[in-house]
Amino acid sequence: MLTFKLVHLIQYHSDRLADSLLCQVKMSGRARSYCNVSPVELKDRVHDIYHHLGSWLLDKRESDIDQRYAAIGARRTEQQVPLSELIWVIVLTKNTLYKFVDDVSVPGQVADIAEKQELLQRLSQFFDEAIYATTAGYEHAAAQRVHPPQASAKTRTNTRQVG
């Protein structure tokens, strides 16, 4: 059973975790293009993940994660954030959670170790899916920018008749 204590602690400290991540992004040489992303927007996105973590891990379907993260990928395409930097920030987001879980876990207690392992496994699955969906959304938006969808043949015909 997923430890609600650890999830609750993450949710309770979501502001602090989001602030920590923002600081890491600013300091990272691997996320330079994030100057194109509003700090408020980034903090809101990260805070939402941390604050609603239990819901994301227990209640959300894969399609919910896909939809949410594909939109993030598309948005970062618009903001001209390279895919490598986008993925790096997702990795930083995950690592911030991992470090927090390590910091608040009581070492040596078998029950806590099992609960921690379960949480880390679920987090890993969540972030793997998030990385895939983000990349797919990013690639789709990038392809749309290079080759915008053409008007349908019917629309082109109607336009010619009017003009």
Regions from the PLM with identified roles:
Residues I65-G163:
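Long, amphipathic alpha-helical coupling/dimerization segments that relay conformational signals between
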Residues L2-S84:
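N-terminal low-complexity or simple alpha-helical regulatory segments
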